[in-house]
């Protein structure tokens, strides 16, 4: 069915499926109605999301439902310890259960895709996003990241309460120089493969649906334009069949990194390397029609990207069940969820023993 839909699309509709807009974007409903949008993020009002899905399904030409994304990192309404804290529990089963609770609560608000797990190896405490990761150890990060994927996605993506997971940020984001966000990361290939890529391979083996490219550059090449990462490692070596989304404005930032001359070149570079969906910015909508007309980006390349996006929508069961009925899911913040969050907090506590007076404490 996904192939049939791709064959029926205009070029503009294909680019629309590759575009994601913020929930408060101007003209959002018109974009959905015109088939110029495949996904929204950061909208959590279930009535608004059901209306957007209604417009997509009933008023757009091809009736393709929307992916609805959100950062569901350590709980949704019921809040669990930060992933760094959860890692201190050393308990994959607990972490899988926490992710499952978060998925069910998010699904009750109309969300069907989380931008998690964040599985960057983090070894520099100066970096501001260290709290989102399970930490510094590649084995622990791999095991716990895979547990989160299983918790979010459940036994089947089409099950009520399951949402698609996204492994981020691919790759090396936690190793940025000086702990400065968006900075360069210089990582030898041996260390890259044995440390920083291991959690991502574990997430892939656990069945993660999507990957998110990093803001940062790796050894001088930004992730959103990095042939080695996206094509060689992820697609060719690992055989990933899902789709890749950019991080927020990361395609536009190819020019900020000095990798491309302008927005037009950035759009072509990201599309040709295999960034299937653009988050927030509009470079694909603004420039891909001309780039395809000029032969700088092949329409067959876009066909494969759109196919991967549609395949996930089909696996999620969105064509059969585009709307959300919160009554079919457990009530957020219920007693069972709150008890699990309390248990997770207690099991994440770490007791420090001041043996031999190593810590400079008087008592």
Predicted features and spans:
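Glycoside hydrolase catalytic-domain context in secreted enzymes
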Residues: 1-363
């Amino acid at each position: 069915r996904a192939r049939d839909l791709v064959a029926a699309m205009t070029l503009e509709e294909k680019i629309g499926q590759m575009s994601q807009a913020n929930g408060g974007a101007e003209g959002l409903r018109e974009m959905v109605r015109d088939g110029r949008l495949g996904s929204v993020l950061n909208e959590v009002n279930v009535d608004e999301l059901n209306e957007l899905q209604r417009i997509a399904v009933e008023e757009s030409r091809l009736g393709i439902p929307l992916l609805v994304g959100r950062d569901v990192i350590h709980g949704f309404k019921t809040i669990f310890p930060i992933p760094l804290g959860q890692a201190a529990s050393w308990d994959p089963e607990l972490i899988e259960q926490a992710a499952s609770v978060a998925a069910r609560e998010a699904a009750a608000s109309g969300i069907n895709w989380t931008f998690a797990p964040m599985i960057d190896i983090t070894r520099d405490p100066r970096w501001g996003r260290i709290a989102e990761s399970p930490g510094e150890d590649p084995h622990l990060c791999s095991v716990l990241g895979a547990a989160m994927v299983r918790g979010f996605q459940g036994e089947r993506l089409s099950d009520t309460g399951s949402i698609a997971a996204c492994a981020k940020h691919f790759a090396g984001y936690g190793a940025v120089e000086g702990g400065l966000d968006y900075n360069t990361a210089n990582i030898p290939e041996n260390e890259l493969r044995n440390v920083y890529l291991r959690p991502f391979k574990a997430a892939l083996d656990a069945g993660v649906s999507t990957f998110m490219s990093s803001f940062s550059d790796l050894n001088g090449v930004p992730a959103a334009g990095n042939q080695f990462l996206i094509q060689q490692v992820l697609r060719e070596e690992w055989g990933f069949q899902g789709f890749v989304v950019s991080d927020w404005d990361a395609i536009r930032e190819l020019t900020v990194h000095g990798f491309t001359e302008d927005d037009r070149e950035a759009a072509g570079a990201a599309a040709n390397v295999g960034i299937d969906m653009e988050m927030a910015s509009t470079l694909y909508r603004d420039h891909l029609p001309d780039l395809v007309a000029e032969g700088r980006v092949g329409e067959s390349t876009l066909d494969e990207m759109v196919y991967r996006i549609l395949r996930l929508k089909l696996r999620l069961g969105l064509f059969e069940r585009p709307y959300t009925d919160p009554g079919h899911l457990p009530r957020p913040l219920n007693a069972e969820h709150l008890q699990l969050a309390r248990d997770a907090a207690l099991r994440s506590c770490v007791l420090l023993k001041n043996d031999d007076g190593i810590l400079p404490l008087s008592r």
